[in-house]
UniProtKB/Swiss-Prot annotation:
Record's protein name: Muzzle protein
Annotated compartments: Virion
GO cellular-component term (any): virus tail
UniProt source species: Bacteroides phage crAss001
Keyword presence, Nucleus: no
Assembly behavior: Homohexamer.
Domain of life: Viruses
Biological classification of the source: Viruses, Duplodnaviria, Heunggongvirae, Uroviricota, Caudoviricetes
Function: Forms the muzzle assembly at the distal part of the tail. May serve as the gatekeeper to control the ejection of the cargo proteins.
Entry keywords, A to Z: Viral tail protein, Virion
Main location: virion
Length: 1371
């Protein structure tokens, strides 16, 4: 056999090759050696590893510091190292590199809920010298952040992204008139806390809606109001630096509001006044996401100052179905009236009711709940983060109380109906608290128009009918020009009795059913309305008279109809939806009365020609009404006809008396002619010719009187033959309204007009008296006016009738033509929006009409054999009228009624689980603290109780000869904010110029609901999952140095779901400014900022969501992934990771390369493969670190550490860094942290690791000339050792091991000069004999291959450099 040799020089380490195929350029095993250069020129030569040295940890005062506990995570930011440990306490340390030591400061020690099973992943951001932040996640707790330059942390929750609110603060907002500047509308305030450069909490408190309006009226949509809002703070949370005030300002109803960041105030602030001139406008959607969601992410990364978080758990638990059912069953619901000590009361001085009864100076808590209406009630709970839970449905409840007026001292106060919910079950309350909830409040689903029981509330007024028009149905009835209240006490004359009307308080009498409007009685002339009307009763004898002849002779006659009525409600006037009702099917009930306490009247008369007398007074108004609305018993009277013209009498034969003045009658509907007794002249002009006359009456009712439940009058009673309901309801229109035929009436559909333009002619009728055959009489006072003294029209509260008389025939000096009037009357007027309907007839065919009070006679009854001219077949006693008995003040009144439904189908969408899920819930009041019981008041409803000035009648045009303005002012429940009117004509004495263009100008924004924040119930079975392992969420883009850290606001507005078949998200990593996501069986690229952002139309930047920037994902591999994120290490060359599913160690740098397969370590990885995550105590999987200074990657396990060099792209050695929890670069140095101590790598003695000697060795395979058998003889190697810089000539390796599959030999390598020894050196080459097999110490190592190991086991600190080895063998 010849002696041969095989040379080995090493460029790496491999393990997978078969021993027979092993490459001599690779080591099979290496321990604590380097093939790359460190301090010397040793690249591709083997050198032993230089060990580490401990770096002292000192406090700022120089005292040594001991790190407490197990290291869970670390972060390096410039010269700072942040350590997170779990020990006696949970600790956060900041270590500042001072060169020779680390100055160590404990930033926090306490309970942070750290766990060794949940190591910490972190990233850091340097913003400026004062703001250097470390963000961390652990998959157990919510995401957290610490500014490591700050050292005054006191609370464990100071670090949470979603902050805890520690106190139950009280915040009250009130309006101050007269300073500041706000655009009209409504405003609401929302409040958050924040720390400077840190997090902002959720909105923990919101105010009710406040009204931006003048002190006595609303504002027009274009107006700016001078007012401000005072905010009072009590017990703010001092753990925060600031409280931030937001305003939500709407200038039109349900429009996108203007949201303003008003002010940032120190938390010791007690008072702030918002004048509307400060602050910054922000995106309205900001408030929907402010504070963010509390999630516990497992991994995170960042790109372009945007934070990505993946595999997260929602920390806020849903309320279970069982607990919801328990809350519902334990809730005791009642209806209450807000008491005198409530924060908001609708109040006014009883002596100045009109001006003070104005609710816009308060807030939206003026709204209550409407009696008889059904509301869907729920409860929400607020946790200590300020976040509100999903809604817990309590049930559908009817409000059983009504707004109640009561007098308190000198003030009248309206008590507001509200719901109250009480929960007293201690088990239920504790279960609520166990979920972290501390507050509760009420929420409501308010009924929509379609869901409402009550369509509207308002007063009922009779209609009027012209005889001729009624017979022709052209129209059958028309809107009454006067509102015609019911009288308190009246005895009415019958058709032939001749009894005068008795009116104790001077009311106008012609308001009862079927009564003619007019009279031949001079004692009632001041209450006449139509100059050409004679008061012909509407009954006739069909057997002797033809109905057509009857009405043809009565073209100017009108009657009052209480069977067909109009309903006047603010909901109809101000809600467009109620102005389009056609044949709506509703029911009617009378719930009370509104009593008139005063009337404000005025009149204006303009003539086109002068007075007849040269010096006559002409228009004389006198005293027509009180000048204020203080309460009285005379509210039922009004201005109708009166002696308003003072002029001479025209005689045929002039005499000295013709210069004496008399007062002349002026009527609401006055003739087209002279205001005195001048007829049509044969030549010249007519004196005192009427050009324009306006009469206005504002009837004022201070309060309502509600009937007890048992006295409420129903138009329809099941099984009652006399109460058969009402016809379908129609809304007012400009033109014809057709009232459907009344049941049991034998009549067809009836025509109705609200707006009238007609001319009334005189019939020269003799049905009343022969004296009228030539015309209607012209009336004047009987006596002359002397000394310029004219009596007031209403000079006596008891009897307001002024003595009048006709011009007697014996005054022969008056021409016959001047005793009578024959000119027609122009009747033109319009009505505001209202509803019209008729009562169905009784089953016996009688007219059902409005009820009377306390059995007062309420209608004109026909005599025997007479019938209504429009219904000759009417039964005996053609009218049916109920009487409602109640005790009240003796005042004129209107019936207060409601249109309602009692069979609403699928209210709120139904009561199924699905319907409840689809409901939108609005908050109804502030929160209350959850104590031993829960007491919730629903302080914000949907119903206003306010004054409605109903403009019933107004001028057709401004040029009409006769015009009437009729207004009824009364309190009413409404779904619209009536006080939102912005005209200046409220409560005026003079209403002559009033029309819809300047009266009741309504700004709908004041009816705005508190619906900026809306809520829903949640299907627990569907949404109880709070773990989202395959989801990524993205924050907004962060600006360095911003006051509030954007990254702390996790909105979940943008999420990206990855493929579920690839397992949960394990790690998010950024490489080359691209985000990559590892799943157990997949690797994907998250496409972020891959296309141009698109700005919004108004130029505002995209906020809240980066939805246009995250465009999806692109999978790089559907099979290769990573289950243990701690095995991932990032370097400029790529991402290193171990896939426990495929048993490989990979490098990803645009493509995935298996380094373990390529470089011969697949089997090694497979042998140590486990399917558990790394954690610092058990260390049962790999933890990877990257040394950026030396381009080495360390794959660390609990019992070994594999090093990969990027310089040579090879695995180089196993290092004694096993079980090290952290290795990191600080500046240009590389450090390791182990056992509570900091170690600087490569700064200690050679072979000394963490204060202990660790051997080094290199193992290779000699397998030349395979498959020939060989006898291994000697090994030669070139190697040198140094002690510092001193060459040691007799030291290299101290052990040689050789083995194959059946032999093993070992020998110590000692070099004895001059003596035989296993190791000899000649010409700088070391030679050693291959040891014999230790089995018998005789056999040579013989095989086709052999493992050769050179090692140094003797403790020393020498540097050794090994160049190559040559194996001599016989073959």
């Amino acid at each position: 056999m010849a002696l041969k040799k095989e040379q080995h020089f090493f460029k790496g380490m491999q393990r997978d090759l078969s021993v027979s195929k092993f490459n001599p350029e690779y080591a099979f095993d290496a321990q604590n050696i380097r093939i790359t250069a460190r301090e010397h020129d040793t690249l591709l030569s083997v050198s032993n590893e230089k060990g580490n040295k401990e770096i002292p940890l000192q406090s700022p005062s120089g005292d040594p510091v001991v790190i407490d506990g197990v290291l869970l995570g670390q972060n390096v930011l410039n010269n700072y190292v942040t350590l997170f440990t779990k020990g006696t306490n949970d600790n956060i340390y900041r270590l500042e590199n001072k060169g020779t030591y680390f100055e160590t400061l404990i930033l926090f020690s306490g309970n942070l809920n750290f766990s060794t099973d949940y190591p910490i992943e972190s990233i850091s951001v340097y913003e400026n010298n004062n703001i250097q932040k470390v963000y961390w996640v652990d998959g157990l707790n919510q995401a957290r952040v610490i500014n490591i330059t700050k050292d005054d942390y006191n609370n464990a929750d100071d670090f949470d992204f979603v902050g805890t609110i520690h106190t139950s603060s009280k915040i009250e907002v009130s309006k101050v008139n007269g300073s500041g500047a706000f655009g009209q509308g409504v405003i609401q305030y929302a409040f958050t806390y924040y720390n400077k450069y840190g997090k902002e909490t959720n909105i923990f408190r919101t105010s009710p809606l406040l009204y931006i309006a003048y002190s006595d009226r609303g504002a027009s949509p274009e107006e700016t109001v001078s007012c401000s809002f005072q905010i009072n703070f009590t017990e703010l949370d001092s753990s925060y630096d600031f409280i931030r005030v937001y305003s939500i300002h709407r200038t039109s109803i349900d429009a996108t509001p203007t949201v303003r960041k008003v002010a940032d105030l120190a938390t010791d602030t007690k008072l702030y006044v918002d004048t509307g001139t400060t602050g910054e406008i922000v995106d309205p959607t900001l408030l929907l996401y402010v504070g963010g969601e509390e999630i516990a992410p497992y991994t995170m990364t960042q790109k372009d100052n945007t934070l990505f978080l993946g595999n997260y758990t929602l920390k806020r638990s849903l309320i279970s179905t069982e607990l919801k059912n328990q809350i519902k069953s334990d809730s005791i619901v009642t209806t209450i009236l807000g008491g005198l000590d409530d924060a908001i009361e609708s109040e006014w001085n009883v002596n100045t009711q009109y001006n003070s009864n104005y609710d816009l100076n308060y807030d939206s808590r003026i709204k209550g709940f409407q009696k008889g209406e059904i509301y869907r009630l729920g409860i929400q709970f607020q946790d200590n983060k300020g976040k509100w839970s999903e809604v817990v449905f309590i049930g559908d409840y009817e409000c059983t109380e009504r707004f109640k007026y009561t007098q308190y001292d000198t003030y009248g106060i309206t008590l507001i109906p509200r719901f109250k919910v009480v929960i007293s079950n201690s088990t239920t309350i504790q279960a609520i608290k166990n979920l972290g909830y501390i507050n509760a409040r009420g929420v409501v689903v308010f009924p929509t128009l379609e869901d409402r029981n009550i369509l509207c509330q308002g007063i009922l007024c009779p209609t009027v009918a012209n005889y001729k028009d009624r017979l022709d149905n052209s129209p059958f009835v028309q809107s009454s020009w006067f509102s015609r209240p019911k009288q308190a006490t009246e005895t009415w004359k019958t058709e032939y009795s001749g009894t005068n009307h008795l009116s104790e308080f001077g009311e106008v009498p012609y308001f009862q059913h079927n009564e003619p409007i007019g009279s031949a009685s001079l004692s009632e002339i001041t209450r006449w309305e139509i100059q050409t009307s004679l008061g012909l009763v509407p009954y006739y004898n069909p057997s002797t008279t033809n109905a057509k002849d009857f009405v043809d002779g009565s073209p100017s006659e009108f009657l009052v109809d209480e069977n067909i009525v109009t309903m006047h409600s603010p909901d109809v006037e101000f809600d467009d939806r109620l102005q389009n009702i056609t044949n709506g099917k509703f029911k009617l009930r009378i719930i009370g009365t509104t009593h008139l306490t005063n009337t404000l009247s005025d009149i204006s008369v303009i003539t086109s020609t002068p007075t007849y007398g040269n010096y006559a007074t002409g228009f004389y108004k006198g005293k027509v009404a009180n000048m204020n609305i203080s309460t009285s018993y005379y509210g039922g009277r009004q201005l109708s006809a009166g002696l308003f013209w003072s002029d001479n009498v025209k005689f045929q034969d002039p005499s000295p008396q013709d210069k004496l003045e008399r007062l002349w009658m002026v009527y609401p509907w006055h003739r087209n002619g002279s205001l005195m007794n001048m007829g049509v002249p044969t030549e010249g002009t007519r004196a005192a010719a009427l050009q324009r006359k306006i009469i206005s009456n504002l009837k004022f009712a201070s309060q309502n009187n509600y009937l007890p439940n048992q006295s409420v009058w129903e138009a329809e009673i099941s099984g009652d033959a006399n109460h058969t309901g009402i016809t379908p309801v129609n809304s007012w229109t400009e033109g014809l309204v057709r009232i459907p035929a009344q049941a049991n009436s034998n009549l067809g559909s009836l025509n109705y007009y609200a707006n009238i333009d007609k001319v009334l002619t005189f019939n020269r009728s003799e049905q009343i008296s022969e004296i009228y055959k030539n015309g209607y009489l012209i009336y004047t006072t009987k006596d002359w006016i002397t000394d310029g003294k004219i009596a007031d029209l209403f000079n006596n509260a008891i009897s307001q009738t002024i003595s009048v008389d006709q011009v007697q025939d014996w005054l022969t000096r008056i021409a016959d033509t001047d005793k009578y009037g024959t000119e027609p009357v122009s009747m033109k007027y319009k009505s505001n929006p209202h509803l019209v309907f008729a009562f169905n007839y009784t089953e016996s065919g009688k007219q059902l009409i409005l009820p009377m009070k306390n059995n007062n006679n309420g209608y004109l009854a026909p005599s025997a054999n007479s019938k209504p001219f429009w219904n000759p077949t009417a039964p005996e006693g053609a009218v049916y009228q109920d009487s409602i008995n109640f005790t009240n003040e003796n005042r004129a009144f209107f019936w207060l009624a409601e249109l309602y439904r009692d069979s609403v189908v699928n209210r709120f969408g139904g009561d199924t689980e699905e319907a409840i899920l689809n409901n939108t819930w609005l908050p109804s009041g502030d929160s209350v603290i959850i104590g031993d019981s829960i007491n919730i008041e629903y302080t914000e409803g949907d119903t206003y109780y306010q004054r409605y000035d109903c403009l019933r009648t107004f001028a057709y045009t401004n040029e009409d000869q006769n015009s009437i303005v009729d207004i009824v002012s009364f309190m009413c429940e409404s779904k619209v904010n009536i006080d939102g009117r912005y005209d200046k004509n409220r409560g005026q004495v003079n209403n002559l110029a009033v029309s819809p263009t300047n009266f009741n100008l309504f700004n709908p924004v004041y009816s705005q609901k508190n619906n900026f924040f809306t809520f829903r119930t949640i299907d627990y079975e569907r949404f109880s999952i709070n773990y989202f392992p395959n989801s990524i969420t993205v924050t907004k883009e962060k600006s360095l140095g911003e006051d509030i850290d954007t990254w702390t606001n996790i909105t979940l507005a943008t999420t990206l779901d990855l493929d579920g078949d690839k397992g949960e998200i394990v790690s998010l990593n950024t490489y080359n400014n691209e985000i990559f996501c590892f799943q157990r069986r997949g690797l994907s690229n998250i496409l972020f900022n891959s296309r141009v952002q698109i700005p919004t139309s108004d130029g505002m930047p995209i906020e809240i969501t980066n939805g246009l920037k995250v465009s999806g994902k692109r999978y790089i591999s559907n099979t290769i992934g990573c289950a243990n994120k701690w095995s991932i290490a990032e370097s400029p060359s790529g991402l290193y990771f171990i896939d426990n599913e495929t048993n490989s160690l990979y490098l990803f740098n645009g493509e995935i390369v298996s380094l373990s397969d390529k470089l011969g370590f697949r089997q090694w990885i497979s042998t140590h493969n486990v399917h558990v995550n790394w954690e610092p105590v058990g260390y049962n999987n790999y933890r990877s670190f990257y040394d950026k200074n030396n381009n080495d990657v360390y794959f660390t396990y609990k019992d070994h550490c594999l090093c990969y060099s990027e310089l040579i792209n090879q695995f180089t050695s196993f290092m004694s860094y096993e079980g090290v929890p952290a290795m990191f670069n600080v500046s240009s140095e590389f450090y390791a942290f182990k056992d509570g101590k900091m170690w600087e790598q490569f700064a200690g003695d050679y072979n000394m690791f963490f204060g202990e000697y660790k051997p080094f060795s290199i193992t290779f395979v000699a397998n030349a000339e395979e498959p020939n058998d060989k006898i291994f003889n000697t090994v030669e190697f070139r190697a040198d050792s140094w002690d510092s810089d001193n060459l040691i000539s007799n030291k290299t390796f101290d052990t040689l091991d050789v083995w194959n599959e059946y032999q093993h030999g070992t020998t110590p390598l000692t070099n004895l000069l001059g003596h035989p020894s296993p190791l000899k050196k000649k010409f700088r080459i070391w030679r050693a004999n291959i040891p014999r097999a230790i089995a018998n110490n005789r056999d040579r190592i013989r095989n086709t291959w052999a493992y050769i190991k050179l090692g140094m086991n003797t403790p020393n600190t020498y540097r050794t450099e090994f160049h190559d080895a040559i194996i001599h063998y016989f073959a």
